[in-house]
Curated annotation (Swiss-Prot):
Belongs to the GTP cyclohydrolase II family. It is an enzyme of class 3 (hydrolase). Keywords: GTP-binding, Hydrolase, Metal-binding, Nucleotide-binding, Riboflavin biosynthesis, Zinc. This is GTP cyclohydrolase-2. One of its GO terms (cellular component) is cytosol. Binds 1 zinc ion per subunit. Zn(2+) binds at residues 54, 65, 67. Its EC number is 3.5.4.25. InterPro entries: GTP_cyclohydro_II (IPR032677), RibA (IPR000926), RibA-like_sf (IPR036144). GO terms for biological process: riboflavin biosynthetic process. The active site is at 126 (proton acceptor), 128 (nucleophile). GO terms for molecular function: GTP binding; GTP cyclohydrolase II activity; zinc ion binding. It catalyses: GTP + 4 H2O = 2,5-diamino-6-hydroxy-4-(5-phosphoribosylamino)-pyrimidine + formate + 2 phosphate + 3 H(+).
């Protein structure tokens, strides 16, 4: 286990009241959060989203990505379902950090795509460690999920880490003229499954 569960509190939101559960990485002290809605106990697979931190999309309403749109849509789907989990994975910018993400944006402004920009900065296309999320699910007592994602790699990594992904639920929202090239690159170079938007 790479994490420990350290704190929890109620979190009222426009979608209803969630239980916010805080986790701490044992090796680094970095924190991550789960939002739990309804009763997630029992054998029925839980609707879940692993959402990687994106300050620009989630809090600053950036149109460069689909992250903020996905966050809102995931919370809506979970609330409509009546039960579910959103893991807020604190690995900003596909885990290159906020300042390097800004540097990557500057390279994208010069014509590089999102993958090329990461490579120019000396990073892989995606530096995230999703095995932490498998530990969060386990600490919440969940071993089977219906995962809201367009990223088959995320499904593969969580499955290898012992989480039973019984269904991949597409979450295709937020495409606009400012992020179309970014989304096309994620599909072409990173294998994301992006069809028509909702």
């Amino acid at each position: 286990m790479q994490l420990k569960r350290v704190a929890e509190a109620k979190l009222p939101t426009p979608w209803g009241d969630f239980l916010m559960v805080g986790f701490e990485e044992l090796a680094t002290g970095h924190d991550h959060v789960a939002l739990v809605f309804g009763d997630i106990s029992g054998q029925t697979p839980v609707l879940a989203r692993v959402h990687s931190e994106c300050l620009t999309g989630d809090a600053l309403f950036s149109l460069r990505c689909d992250c903020g749109f996905q966050l809102e849509a995931a919370l809506t789907h979970i609330a409509e379902e009546g039960r579910g989990i959103l893991l807020y994975h604190r690995q900003e910018g596909r885990n290159i950090g906020l300042l390097n993400k800004i540097r990557a944006y500057a390279l994208q402004d010069q014509g590089y795509d999102t993958v090329e920009a990461n490579h120019q900065l000396g990073f892989a296309a995606d530096e995230r460690d999703f095995t932490l999320c498998a530990d969060m699910f386990k600490l919440l007592g969940v071993d089977a999920v219906r995962l809201l994602t367009n990223n088959p790699k995320k499904v593969e990594i969580l499955t290898e880490a012992g989480i039973n992904i019984v269904e991949r639920v597409p979450l295709i929202v937020g495409r606009n003229p400012k992020n179309a090239h970014y989304l096309d690159t994620k599909a072409a170079k990173m294998g994301h499954l992006l069809g028509k938007t909702e």
